[in-house]
Swiss-Prot record:
This is NAD(P)H-quinone oxidoreductase subunit 5, chloroplastic. Pfam families: Proton_antipo_C. It is a multi-pass membrane protein. Keywords: Chloroplast, Membrane, NAD, NADP, Plastid, Plastoquinone, Quinone, Thylakoid, Translocase, Transmembrane, Transmembrane helix, Transport. GO terms for biological process: ATP synthesis coupled electron transport; electron transport coupled proton transport. It comes from the Eukaryota. It comes from Brachypodium sylvaticum (False brome). The chain crosses the membrane at residues 84-104, 152-172. Its EC number is 7.1.1.-. It catalyses: a plastoquinone + NADH + (n+1) H(+)(in) = a plastoquinol + NAD(+) + n H(+)(out); a plastoquinone + NADPH + (n+1) H(+)(in) = a plastoquinol + NADP(+) + n H(+)(out). Coiled coil: none annotated.
Length: 214
């Protein structure tokens, strides 16, 4: 039997976050994008074993894995396939309906009764590409300008959401975008306050839960 057995374990470097995942302690969670190198050690223990008198062995057993990557911060859990597939199906229908250009105000009179004829001409596109007139060029220019403005706003929203909730392996993590905004005291910084408001609004689902909790 071993005598004078003693072992010490290193303290845990992780804590439980609001999202149910482990995050490193002592790290400011507001700075989602960080460029600090780190190594992750699953456990490490120092064991001092003594046999009899004058026969002492010191053994250190450790099992560590070095990822050689940057600190991985937790993010909100992404939606699963249960939500993804219905959204993709809805996207396909929306795309083709918008491309075809169904005239929803197309109505006919039948004995004084207004009848909708949406599906009667649903294969007729809203833009006739074989038409050669000045009106066609004007309509095309207006369509392109409106499409560029709306798509640009959508891309801007996706870009902002990707910075806040994107993957830890994203390219923007190397740019250190968020930390560049928080120079000096973060609580007095304008960008810090804006980020805090947006995060609070999205975390509380646009404060809709307040009405349900009443």
């Amino acid at each position: 039997h071993f005598q004078n057995y003693s072992s010490t374990k290193e303290g845990s470097l992780y804590s439980i976050s609001l999202w149910g995942n482990r995050i490193p302690k002592g790290v400011n969670k507001d700075f989602v994008l960080s460029t600090t190198k780190s190594e992750v050690s699953f456990f490490s223990q120092n064991i001092s074993i003594s046999k009899g008198q004058g026969n002492t062995r010191n053994r250190t057993g450790s099992f560590s894995t070095s990822f050689g990557s940057k600190n991985l911060f937790t993010y909100p859990h992404e939606t699963g396939n249960t939500m993804l597939f219905p959204l993709l199906i809805l996207l396909l229908f929306t795309f083709f309906i918008g491309f075809i250009g169904i005239p929803f105000d197309n109505r006919t009179m039948d004995n004084g009764i207004v009848r909708l004829t949406i599906l009667s001409k649903w294969l007729i596109p809203s833009i006739n590409f074989t038409q050669e007139s000045s009106n066609f060029s004007i309509n095309s220019y207006e369509f392109i300008t409106n499409a560029i403005s709306s798509v640009s706003l959508a891309i801007l929203g996706l870009f902002i959401a990707y910075i806040f909730y994107g993957s830890a392996y994203s390219f923007f993590q190397n740019l250190d975008l968020q930390n560049s905004f928080y120079k000096g005291s973060p609580k007095k910084n304008f960008f810090y306050q804006v980020k805090k408001k947006i995060y609070s609004w999205s975390y509380n689902r646009g404060y809709i839960d307040i009405f349900y909790s009443r």
